[in-house]
């Protein structure tokens, strides 16, 4: 080890070059690192959505949810499985373990879903399996509204033009249209006219299936030519559908237009969206797991001017929400703290060393260690985020320790009469092994945090290894650069300056005061021990009364809300409830914008977001605004309204801070009864502001009983009855038609 330190003291150019290489390579690595709010976590969810138009919740549960659940429960890497069976739709969510391979789990899930596809009802749509890795919330929401275009027209334009452009931005995983209404050929049957003309629902379905048919007619080949054939066997307009013959009574033809109203309209009437009180359609921008959110949003903002320039007259585009505003502010605050911490450390070092030259040597260690650790961050695939920046803030006070020890030891030999060069040689020999021991000890304290499993380990791994890496780099610099700088910069001071003398006198006074207090405490040992016991007891009390949480709630300038209408409600009812919520929110001066998506995730629910004014323009914090809104939402009579802060950490879902899962081998009626009793007890306790049960067992329904004997006498079977009901009431999908290069459903 002596030869190692001697090499750099005797060869100052080598020591300088090595340090410059650390600075250069670390700086280049730092410029290439991603900048994000938190470390990237591979939290992945796989969602299986199956629609069965017109089916009741119990039918969905028994014929769709249960078979798929049983099939995918053994899929690889699953941590938890959650399913929901609602009117028309089954949703199964698989939450994967953090260490699971998402691609392998996706392939395994697809295979198992395909195995049970034949067991599902014939009229049910194919299950849609979607994998989502990374943040569950969008990085940005774009709002599109118009006074002249319908929601379907806006949605169609966004689908054809805007969505594809946004998805070409580097790092964008999906540009999802929310609150829109897709075009469809809607056929509204008139049962009275159908009965008068002797036409059944099955006749209509059969005619549509037979006469709106897409044909691949092939091509005609001759000796020198080859010409494709386009057979016009499909329908392309409401007028063409109206002329479709569905029955013939002698010479009289019954056309579809005789028994139905036909129009090109929205595919469904179960969703709508609002931005600041105006009807709108949103696009949510979701980033890939490895993408830098700041770069992604910068890319989206860069193409927004050209998107706005190409919008049809009367269509406006607005950035409704940008999550990177908080990310940038957070990183700025931590970076500012980093600079402040460095300045404080420099002042403290100067006050204790009392010499500019002695102070300069450990100060050099700060940028070299912080920049040098960037090499390790890049090698490990880490990013610059709040936790790695926090590690750098803490490292500032640690990386100077080794250099200060080296400077003090060498300075002691110089004061004893040795030359700076000889003092550096001897001082480095004496302190080399203690420096190595200090470095390894500090690194060993923090590094084990990086091996913790679960969400905590995924979040704090980068923090631990960044801190340990900075300490290791500082130890290397203390053994290579610091002794060389001491041999060149330090000298024997014959007389101290006035500032050094002032600092020495101040510390001498402090030392004398401490000495007096120390003697006093030794003279009253019983009292000293009693004070110690009291402090320890008070510490225990304070620890027990301190709230515990994985991460504190931060003021992100954004609040979320879920609105749930009664089970009998439709979209009109939900819109009425959200309008009341919008009125209450707009009365809060700290709120700048409000967006709402009605019919999400179902027609009796809505999702809302409240954007707060910039931090400098409001006096109340996000938590205070939430506390002001919650009582107002409890007074909304039409629905249950819950407001909450966005999740503080990636991988968390936000929402209710306390949740209970009730399981039973009995029926759902028993489960609902127990859940409602628990909810009532929670309300009566006075400890909960909002309570909700996700099992809704009070949904009203009409029960249609068929007299099988009478049906047989008139020649009607159960399949005919079921098909007729599904066609008349369920809004069944029949087939597709083409319009301007895109296909739409016939319903």
Please tell me what each predicted stretch does.
Residues 1-343, 384, 458, 639, ...:
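Membrane-proximal extracytoplasmic
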Residues 1-35, 431, 499-550, 610, ...:
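Signature of alpha-helical transmembrane segments and their immediate interfacial
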Residues 14-18, 335-344, 365, 369, ...:
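Hydrophobic alpha-helical transmembrane segments of multipass membrane transporters and ion channels
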Residues 25-32, 36-37, 343-412, 419, ...:
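Hydrophobic transmembrane alpha-helices and their membrane-interface caps
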Residues 29, 268, 323, 360, ...:
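C-terminal transmembrane helical bundles of large multi-pass transporters
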Residues 320, 327, 331, 407, ...:
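Helix-loop junctions and hydrophobic alpha-helical segments within the transmembrane domains
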Residues 347-352, 372-387, 436-487, 540, ...:
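Hydrophobic, glycine/alanine-rich multi-pass transmembrane helices and their short helix-loop junctions
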Residues 532-632, 656, 677, 708:
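Juxtamembrane segments of multi-pass membrane proteins
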